[in-house]
Amino acid sequence: DLPEIQINFTPMVVKEEGKRATFSIQNFLNLGKAVIARGKSAIPGVQLDINLQQPKSVGSIKLSSSNPFDKPIIDPNYLSDQRDIEDFTKAFRHLRYITEQDAFKDVLNTEISPGSNIKTDDDIHSAIRNLTTTGHHPVSTCRMGNDNDKSAVLDNKFIVRGTKNLRVVDASAFPDQINGNINAAVIMMGEKAADIILDIPPLKREDPRETTI
């Protein structure tokens, strides 16, 4: 089976305001600068983030008008599928189990968020709904698929159906979510699309058992 969750460990706590974490790359870099300047964390602690690798909830992007310069209507539709809530809950409990091990006793003290008082499934579900945000790896908004797939925007050459030379080559072309971060897969897709556009034939398949180094 493929992994269902990814856990990110960050050696500092990103400050929160209200219910939503105020994480941004700039905030993270500022905290990093503070660590270097002061020789210690600006906000001492460790942050552990849970990422679902195969979320079941599906969002959408729709045109707001016929004007291509108007902003689209984006609905991430987070946690609309109850299975995501259940997967997050299992991951949350497992993460607590990890932090309770002897190896962490000398370095971890108080659970800042959502707090050690959050114990029941209902409380955990509420915390998940309040704290969940993007993992910055959205995919499949212009997905590739066969001619019989009405949800497929692109054909197998990355061309937008109904056009001749308009292609989309990025994570939105993924037919489905992959397990893990998308950077390497997007680079691979770009290389493949370049070969298709330049009409470069695929590499010959080789038997690794016959490859010499």
For each of these PLM feature ranges, what is it?
Residues 1-185, 193-213:
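FAD-dependent oxidoreductase catalytic-site/capping-region signature
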